[in-house]
């Protein structure tokens, strides 16, 4: 399993990379706006430079099909390791099918059903991103969707990789790994929480107290 960071914050990415466990980044218009960034291309290229061997997803912002196609072509030129994020819509599928044949890699995002994931794989998407947290918020079982997609992809030999997205807490990461998702994209806060455990903290405190007691 691989871990991606779901952020457009350069400092968070640098900190995450120092841990040696992050191999990709996903961004979207909301994350970029959160950072007050107006030059999307520049920040994506910065991120791509930080992870020359990693996958960096950058999302289109257009809704008109012709403009979506234009943006997808443009984003694909930003860096060798950029992946174009495109919504799971009929228009998105058409663009994935067309440009994947030209070597453009796509991350089909906002996936909320097995059928969407199936069609994305058939169209040639390199990645598909089921949104676990948002499904949970709506009263559905987000992890069951991940499990079903992984099972179907395995059954039919699809090479499309599953990115468990909309991760809200460390348990989501555990569950994603258990279901066989190849990737989980997580906020920096969740990444750090994954390494935390109260027994680790208390164990360190006990060891240090014992060591100091024999140094007197």
UniProtKB/Swiss-Prot annotation:
UniProt-listed InterPro entries: Aldolase_TIM, TAL/FSA, Transaldolase_3B, Transaldolase_3B/F6P_aldolase, Transaldolase_AS, TSA/FSA_arc/bac
Subcellular localization(s) per the UniProt record: Cytoplasm
Active-site residues per Swiss-Prot or TrEMBL entry: 85
Taxonomy, superkingdom: Bacteria
Principal location class: cytoplasm
One GO MF term: transaldolase activity
SUPFAM superfamilies membership: Aldolase (SSF51569)
Gene3D superfamilies (UniProt xref): Aldolase class I
EC number: 2.2.1.2
GO BP terms: carbohydrate metabolic process; pentose-phosphate shunt
Keywords: Cytoplasm, Pentose shunt, Schiff base, Transferase
Pathway(s) annotated for this protein in UniProt: Carbohydrate degradation; pentose phosphate pathway; D-glyceraldehyde 3-phosphate and beta-D-fructose 6-phosphate from D-ribose 5-phosphate and D-xylulose 5-phosphate (non-oxidative stage): step 2/3
GO cellular component, one term: cytoplasm
Record NCBIfam families: fsa_talC_mipB
Function per UniProt: Transaldolase is important for the balance of metabolites in the pentose-phosphate pathway.
Protein name, per record: Probable transaldolase
Species for this entry: Dehalococcoides mccartyi (strain ATCC BAA-2266 / KCTC 15142 / 195) (Dehalococcoides ethenogenes (strain 195))
Gene: tal
């Amino acid at each position: 399993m691989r871990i991606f960071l779901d952020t457009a914050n350069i400092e968070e990415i640098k900190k995450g990379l120092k841990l040696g466990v992050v191999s990709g980044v996903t961004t979207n218009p909301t994350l970029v706006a959160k950072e007050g960034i107006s030059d999307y291309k520049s920040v994506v290229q910065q991120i791509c430079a930080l992870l020359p061997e990693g996958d960096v997803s950058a999302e289109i912002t257009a809704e008109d099909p012709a403009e979506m196609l234009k943006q997808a072509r443009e984003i694909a030129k930003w860096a060798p390791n950029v992946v174009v994020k495109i919504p799971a819509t009929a228009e998105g599928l058409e663009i994935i099918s067309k440009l994947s044949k030209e070597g453009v890699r796509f991350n089909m995002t906002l996936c909320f059903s097995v059928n969407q994931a199936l069609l994305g794989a058939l169209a040639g998407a390199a990645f598909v991103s089921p949104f676990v947290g948002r499904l949970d918020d709506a009263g559905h079982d987000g992890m069951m969707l991940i499990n079903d997609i992984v099972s179907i992809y395995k059954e039919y030999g699809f090479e499309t990789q599953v990115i468990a997205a909309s991760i809200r807490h460390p348990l989501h990461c555990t569950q994603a790994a258990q279901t066989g998702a190849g990737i989980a994209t997580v906020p920096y806060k969740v990444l750090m929480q994954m390494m935390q455990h109260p027994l680790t903290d208390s164990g360190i405190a006990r060891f240090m107290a014992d060591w100091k007691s024999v140094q007197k």
